[in-house]
Swiss-Prot record:
Taxonomic path: Eukaryota, Metazoa, Ecdysozoa, Arthropoda, Hexapoda
Keywords linked to the UniProt accession: Developmental protein, Differentiation, Glycoprotein, Spermatogenesis
The protein's role, per its UniProt record: Post-meiotically transcribed gene that has a role in late spermiogenesis; required for actin cone progression during spermatid individualization.
Compositional bias annotation for Low complexity: 14-24
Region annotated Disordered, chain positions: 11-57
Keyword Glycoprotein annotated: yes
One record GO biological process: sperm individualization
Listed InterPro entries: Soti (IPR031397)
UniProt-annotated glycosylation sites, renumbered to this chain: 83
Pfam family, one: SOTI
Domain of life: Eukaryota
Protein name: Male-specific protein scotti
Family to which this protein belongs: Belongs to the male-specific scotti family.
């Protein structure tokens, strides 16, 4: 740029506006230009403010793949084995559909129909005492 034109335009030396008390302009010198290799540093955007919120600047890792579950290792509900015979268990299952007021009658009818010599010949399979299968 032509120095005469530069003096006519009167560029501010430090970017703070038109400063007539600038010693460089009073002596007729050009303001110092930064070194050309430093241009890329001066043009760089400002860094984000530090220690404001450190969680905003954390780099999150990609999510880890979930472990595939095997049907052999998944837990199943444990069914408690009680001291109830198959006849008692089947009778209990049968009366679940009955209304609560008539469950006693349904139980008696079920035992009358199913606890007979056809289902249990010579009493084989019937419990001899409570808790025995």
């Amino acid at each position: 740029m032509d120095p005469r034109l530069y003096r006519l335009i009167r560029f501010p030396s430090n970017g703070l506006g038109n400063n007539n008390n600038d010693p460089n302009q009073q002596r007729g010198e050009r303001p110092r230009q930064p070194h050309p290799d430093l241009g890329w540093i001066l043009d760089a955007p400002n860094e984000p403010p530090r220690n404001r919120n450190p969680l905003l600047y954390l780099v999150t890792a990609p999510p880890r793949p979930r472990k595939k579950r095997s049907f052999m290792t998944t837990s199943k509900p444990f069914r408690i084995q009680t001291n109830v015979s198959d006849l008692q268990y089947n009778a209990w299952q049968a009366i679940q559909d009955a209304p609560p007021e008539k469950r006693c009658e349904y139980y008696v009818k079920y035992m009358d129909e199913h606890m007979n010599s056809q289902n249990y010949p010579n009493g084989v399979g019937l419990p001899h005492r409570w808790g025995q299968f």
